[in-house]
Amino acid sequence: MTDTNHSSMRQHSLQSLAIAAIGVVFGDIGTSPLYSLKEAFSPAHGIPLTPSAILGVISLLFWAIILVVGIKYVLFVMRADNNGEGGVLALMALSLRPLNPKSRITGLMMALGIFGACMFYGDAVITPAISVMSAVEGLEVATPQLSHLVLPITIVILIALFWIQRHGTATVGKLFGPIMVLWFVTIAVLGIYHIARAPMIVSAINPYYAFSFMSEHVLLAYVVLGSVVLVLTGAEALYADMGHFGAKPIRLAAYVLVMPSLVLNYFGQGALLLLDPKAIENPFFLLAPQWAALPLVVLSTVATVIASQAVISGAYSLTSQAIQLGYVPRMKILHTSELAIGQIYVPVVNWLLLFVILCIVIGFKSSDNLAAAYGIAVTATMVITTILAAVVMVKVWNWNKLLVAMIIGVFLVIDLGFFGANLLKVEQGGWLPLGIGALLFFLLMTWYKGRHIVKERTAADGIPLAPFLQGLLAHPPHRVSGTAIYLTGNDTLVPVSLLHNLKHNKVLHERTIFMTFVTRDIPYVKDHERVTVHDAGEGLYIVKAEYGFNETPDVKAVLEEVARQRGMTFELMDTSFFLARETVVPTHLPGMSIWRERVFAWMHQNAAKPTDFFAIPANRVVELGTKIEI
């Protein structure tokens, strides 16, 4: 095949990935025009709809998109990939790699990363609610007589969206890209039409209008910044979803279609307001002629459902990562596609999200009310991403500290400005994502600290495995036929389940395997590096299986690899799995306060069973109980 053909194939693949990325990565930021400008001129802000104010706000929107999306995320942050993977937890793992595990900065970076992940969930409960609701509210423009149905229709759409998650979205997901391409083209065309009617709006490209607006209104302009940030919701997704599509397709989509379409639509809305300030009632839907209003409502609703789907899938992926990294208790994870590894479904997360989202929709009643709650989670994550990226630039890339200070300084001024403006909205609704994030942060840190204490207690009371096996082989117990697998969290200590088995049954299987799963700080582990097998003699094997934080441990696959390496055969239904069922007992020993220990014990008790998490046949499991005082 010629170089020209290879180049053509690569180009086709790049374009295909870019279209797919448009359907997943850009849904949230792509549906922001539904409510962003309307919220910026909310009556609560008291900004007059004068030409200078309109030009000033549009200029702010334009430069926010250019500086934060086009430069910060696309050019800089997306360089900080963890073996191709992005997102706040992946960035945290990358930033921790060169640091001393016991240093204070390590603890600070870990806490920042976890808090950033928690704030994502605060965002994840608002995005579907405000997106779908703002789209359905287009009925108030298209068919005012149906305005009383906005809330019921929103609720039905959201319930249906979460109901289908169990069955996966691989099939309909193929349509997401083309639909979102149609969406971006549509909003661009609507914008161009009105820009042509009021070309004066193009002058908002000049940052003079943004600075003039800020200096003229000062305090009110700072409040408006809290609404301007709504145009950036979803910017973090460019980085978080990088592992699915790669940096090049996302950059191509951002620069060629997404950013130009967004800018054209916002400028079109600004032009409409210059022509008719009363259009602030709903500037997005009033861009369309009356005959196109209803089709636009339908397209908007589909686009917001796609945007919501991306956030929901992101919540599943983030939960899976957090479980593997040890910040969240084990949960049942189902794979909804045999072909796409990333297509997963986490039932607990799904139904909790739906419950909270429905409460939000019913409680806030309109997208206008909900807009006050939106933004604070986004800006908090933006600040955290900037700080973690700075650590990576200095510690991992070894960039000049002065250069990093200059780059990060500019980004932090912007991020902290937006974050501070959103703090002003805490009373109006900003408390919601902050409260959700704070609660989750407490639970995740409690779980992480509790697991650390459990490991310390277990290690202190544990028996080293190597000398124990030597003694066991020197004075062997009665051997019985079959295979026994002891799952253990520490491959240097004797599994408690083995001690109990020897104590009560006084037998050892002919083939005994000690299996440990280890999660590394990279997203994926190469297949040939995954499983190591140590032959301890006389049918005893120590198996270590390493997985990345984006992968789910698979006992069956590990056994197949052990069989391949050692020339064995395994029959899963003829194999016994021995597990230690730990019962955590809160005490006044040093570690955590007693009330936090009780919270940890409750989380430990309600974690998914190892049989569910590791997909082990329940009828092949022997559980032996043990108490651990913390």
UniProtKB/Swiss-Prot annotation:
Keywords: Cell inner membrane, Cell membrane, Ion transport, Membrane, Potassium, Potassium transport, Symport, Transmembrane, Transmembrane helix, Transport. GO terms for cellular component: plasma membrane. Pfam families: K_trans (PF02705), K_trans_C (PF22776). It catalyses: K(+)(in) + H(+)(in) = K(+)(out) + H(+)(out). It is a multi-pass membrane protein. The chain crosses the membrane at residues 17-37, 51-71, 105-125, 144-164, 175-195, 218-238, 255-275, 283-303, 344-364, 374-394, 402-422, 428-448. One of its GO terms (molecular function) is potassium ion transmembrane transporter activity. It is found in: Cell inner membrane. The keyword Ion transport applies. It comes from the Bacteria. Transport of potassium into the cell. Likely operates as a K(+):H(+) symporter. Belongs to the HAK/KUP transporter (TC 2.A.72) family. This is Probable potassium transport system protein Kup. It comes from Burkholderia pseudomallei (strain K96243).
